[in-house]
Swiss-Prot record:
It catalyses: N-(5-phospho-beta-D-ribosyl)anthranilate = 1-(2-carboxyphenylamino)-1-deoxy-D-ribulose 5-phosphate. CDD domains: PRAI (cd00405). One of its GO terms (biological process) is L-tryptophan biosynthetic process. InterPro entries: Aldolase_TIM, PRAI_dom, RibuloseP-bd_barrel, TrpF_fam. GO terms for molecular function: phosphoribosylanthranilate isomerase activity. Belongs to the TrpF family. It comes from the Archaea. Pathway: Amino-acid biosynthesis; L-tryptophan biosynthesis; L-tryptophan from chorismate: step 3/5. This is N-(5'-phosphoribosyl)anthranilate isomerase. Its EC number is 5.3.1.24. It comes from Sulfolobus acidocaldarius (strain ATCC 33909 / DSM 639 / JCM 8929 / NBRC 15157 / NCIMB 11770). The keyword Coiled coil does not apply. The keyword Amino-acid biosynthesis applies. It is an enzyme of class 5 (isomerase). The gene is trpF.
Length: 199
């Protein structure tokens, strides 16, 4: 079954609800520019109340340092890395999720990070733009990938149709930035479960 990551969690209440509804893991954004920003210590606090894996999402900063200092089970780096950075964190590959833009110009980068054994999240190249689902579908046929980029209850089936290993949902399950909508969260979980039984 496709796994579900609810990202942009900014309250203990939403974290507990995500686990209760059936999310497989939850994400926390520690980039200060984000409206969903939380401090690293908050992740450690939440981990005392939930059992599902936690993911820290970073955009800037030294990647090795960020991995060493994270309070989460996994760390997601939401930028394209240099070859030097990839080599630097290769030993942590099972703990790291790398963002790959859904664009033809990143085909070589995609194959590099896959060949190195990293977990991959395919997302839109530019924030707010649509994901290239045709490209992602081709990648998903060959490799196990995660997919994100504006997933909501209304377009969930479009993303599930590429057969990803997992989906990353954030703004599509919000009442407003930083606050989740329980009904939308439930619709995503139910949609994924129904999809499993129709395949």
């Amino acid at each position: 079954m496709v796994k579900v990551k609810f990202c942009g969690i900014a309250s203990l209440e939403d974290a507990i609800l995500a686990e209760k509804l059936g999310a497989d893991f939850i994400g926390f954004v520690t980039d200060t520019a984000s409206p969903r920003f939380v401090k690293k210590d908050f992740i450690g606090f939440v981990r005392r109340y939930v059992e599902i894996p936690t993911v820290e999402v970073i955009v800037k900063g030294n990647v090795s340092e960020s991995i060493d200092k994270t309070k989460a089970d996994l760390i997601q780096i939401h930028r394209v890395l240099t070859r030097r950075e990839l080599d630097e964190i290769h030993m942590y590959r099972k703990k790291v999720i790398l963002y790959v833009p859904s664009s033809d110009m990143y085909q070589e980068y995609f194959r590099s990070v896959i060949s190195m054994g990293f977990n991959v999240l395919v997302d839109s190249e530019i924030k707010g733009s649509k994901v290239n689902l045709d490209l992602a579908r081709g990648w998903a046929k060959e490799y196990e990938i995660g997919i994100g980029g504006g997933i909501s209850p209304d377009n969930l089936h479009d993303f599930l149709s590429i057969n990803p290993k997992w989906i990353d949902v954030s703004s599509g399950i919000e009442k407003y930035k930083g606050k989740k909508d329980p009904s939308k969260m439930l619709k995503i979980i139910e949609g994924v479960r129904k999809w499993k039984y129709t395949q």
